[in-house]
Every structure is written in C-alpha cells, then in structure tokens.
Amino acid sequence: FSPAYTDYEIDEIAQCSSHLVFNSLSQFNRFHLQSKQANSNISIGLRVNPEYSEVETLLYNPCAAGTRFGVPADKLPQQLPADIEGFHIHCHCENDSDVFERTLQHIEDKFSPWFKQIKWINFGGGHLMTRKGYDIKRLVSILQKFKTKYPHLKVILEPGSAFAWQTGSLVSQVVDIVEDKGISTAILNVSFTCH
C-alpha cells in the first residue's frame, strides 16, 4: 500500500506484488489497467475508511477529519469496478482486540453491502498481538465469527510493529540541527511515523 503511486514506479511495484491496494478511486482508475498488464495475477484492492478509530494521537489516526487515507463508504459506487477484489482497512495503532472488535462493527456497518463483491479483506496492522496481556483468544473469536458470517472472504492481518515489539534498539544518527524561534530540533535519519 502507498497513499499514491506514480507512473515511473507502478510497473515495478505491480511486478513484485501479489496484492496492490489503491488509496483512492482516482488512483485505481489511473493505474489498475497498467498494473494488470504488468502482472496479470495481481489482486487489486481499495483502501476504505470506516471513519472510526480509537487512535488517540491525531498524527497516527488515519480516520481523523481531513484524512488522506481511504475511501469512505459514501464515496463508493454501489457496484464496485470489476478489478477491485479486496478492501484494506488500517485504523489501529498499538491496539488490543477489544478495540478491533468495536472497529469491526463500524466496518461491517459501513461496508458490508460490498462484501459480496470482494474476495479478501485486509484489517491492516496496529494490532499489538505480541504485547504482554493482549487478548489473543478474543481476537481469534472475533475473526472466527467474522469468517462464519462471510465465509468467502479471505482475512488478512498485517504483522505491523507487533513482531518487532521490544526486540531491540533503534539506531539512528543526527544528520542536522535546525533552529526556529529558539527551538532546536535534531533531524534524524529515521522516521517517527513510518506510515
């Protein structure tokens, strides 16, 4: 997934991918045929926005007002374009399964009318499954109930930071220091927000 693709990279990305998710209908319309020509086996999806997230830090909340991430339900056509095979929803950040359960209700409320038209659903990352105290049994139960309701949908969960959680140190380098109005800021060669 990327919020936007460009002409000079889409062929290479499609050739290296089994799935390709577009962030908007305009990106889908611009690149889906080119992606299919580059890789006839690629499965194309669309990032959708359930307009609900319990992420408290606005910087990390992809459902905050004015977001650039995903298509809300009221912007989707009743009949999806034939090449859209899946939905991608990413609206968690270090959350537990209780948050996923509440979020899933919003996802179903908004997007279940299209579930018959797709083959897979990617619930994104941000599920901190490896954190001590994470309720794995609850997550499994939630996913089993969902699969019972929608047996044709392949469910995808991204590992995200959960698999690197507390596994080592982040090593970076100060590459510059900028000053503005008496505030000095170190510019590092790593990103605080990788998404």
Residue positions per predicted region:
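C-terminal active-site-proximal or functional interface alpha/beta core segments in diverse enzymes
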Residues: 91-195
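Active-site-proximal beta-alpha core segment in soluble small-molecule metabolic enzymes
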Residues: 1-120, 142-145, 187
